[in-house]
Curated annotation (Swiss-Prot):
Gene3D superfamilies: Archease domain (3.55.10.10). Coiled coil: none annotated. This is Protein archease. GO terms for molecular function: calcium ion binding. Activates the tRNA-splicing ligase complex by facilitating the enzymatic turnover of catalytic subunit RtcB. Acts by promoting the guanylylation of RtcB, a key intermediate step in tRNA ligation. Can also alter the NTP specificity of RtcB such that ATP, dGTP or ITP is used efficiently. It comes from Aeropyrum pernix (strain ATCC 700893 / DSM 11879 / JCM 9820 / NBRC 100138 / K1). It comes from the Archaea. Keywords: Calcium, Metal-binding, tRNA processing.
Amino acid sequence: MQCGGWMHEEHTADVLVIAYGRTLEEAFENAARGVYEVVTDTSRVEPRRRVDASIEGIDLENLLYRFIENLIAYTDSEGLVFGLFRVCKIECNGESCSIVASAWGEEFDPSRHEHRTIVKAMTYADMEIKEENGCWRVQFVVDI
């Protein structure tokens, strides 16, 4: 078992993203990075534009869904790809969860960015968020 980073596994016509972190915030950051590694080589994305997000969800799963879907919306509407992610905090009370996060990236430039696959949407398929032995594991499927 690893505790940090992300990985992809084959999952029919979709991509299963599995992300890890020592904190829930780090696992969400790695989940976002995992999604954008499906799209391009994130190490080549310059942090030219910052996007801030303050998002609420009814539970952790809904929060993860809305967080990733928010990033995908910027890609769809403005052509942005992201390579750096910072989740400042995730809080849950009995009624809802919230996240405060930032992502840095730039417009996709085919002369500098590798075109891999278009991520169409976030899904709830195979979604799991759990903590085990001091390591958070976040798993979900994106539609490509």
